[in-house]
Amino acid sequence: MTDSQTETHLSLILSDTAFPLSSFSYSYGLESYLSHQQVRDVNAFFNFLPLSLNSVLHTNLPTVKAAWESPQQYSEIEDFFESTQTCTIAQKVSTMQGKSLLNIWTKSLSFFVTSTDVFKYLDEYERRVRSKKALGHFPVVWGVVCRALGLSLERTCYLFLLGHAKSICSAAVRLDVLTSFQYVSTLAHPQTESLLRDSSQLALNMQLEDTAQSWYTLDLWQGRHSLLYSRIFNS
């Protein structure tokens, strides 16, 4: 495990809005959700955000935790995660972001990490994804990469949720629902901080078998995204 200063340094890098995960291309169902509301305003967004975070907690965080705890089982964990996905759009987004993170690992991060068993598992995983023998789902890759970097499980879960919250808020700005100032105040708000902290704590006690969709209509909105007459995002 890395020391606290190094963990903080890596956390700031991983949570940077310029971190090249292509998150700006996805609204994670927000665009479709807003398009199906009678009133497309900030109140609709604030209804969406906590429900979306809770969905990610229950659909993704058990996999993040399992991948961090047992990186050598990345293939089995990925197969399980794939089997639980109920929305093809969400599946596509997950694999695209996972592949992006694997590229970041290979081209930017791996040079600064001492070779360990986790390092070897991750390199093997990357080769399998490149040869199309694995899918590279984002929560699996995230868990293994954070373990290779020496981040704690709690920090790994928190950063995953924070990244999702930032992506949703950023999408809301581009959709002209939030101003740039509201983007900052939303993320800095004590309720958002409490939601992220409490959710990451819940994730620590989750098992793969706890994976479930807590907000079923989110899958419907994401599934209808390609049917929107006009759209900015890919999901």
Curated annotation (Swiss-Prot):
An example Pfam family from this entry, by short name, is UreF
A GO MF annotation of the entry reads: nickel cation binding
**UniProt keyword annotations, A-Z:** Chaperone, Cytoplasm, Nickel insertion, Nucleus
Name a GO CC annotation attached to this entry.
Answer: nucleolus
Q: Which GO terms fall under biological process for this protein?
A: urea metabolic process
Asked whether the UniProt record includes Transcription regulation among its keywords, one would answer no
Asked whether the UniProt record includes Nucleus among its keywords, one would answer yes
Taking the first listed entry, what is the main subcellular location of this protein, grouped into a coarse class?
Answer: cytoplasm
Q: Where in the cell is it found?
A: Cytoplasm; Nucleus
Q: Report the leader peptide range.
A: none
Q: What does this protein do?
A: Probably facilitates nickel incorporation.
Give the family, as the similarity comment puts it: Belongs to the UreF family.
Protein name in UniProt: Uncharacterized urease accessory protein UreF-like
Native organism? Schizosaccharomyces pombe (strain 972 / ATCC 24843)
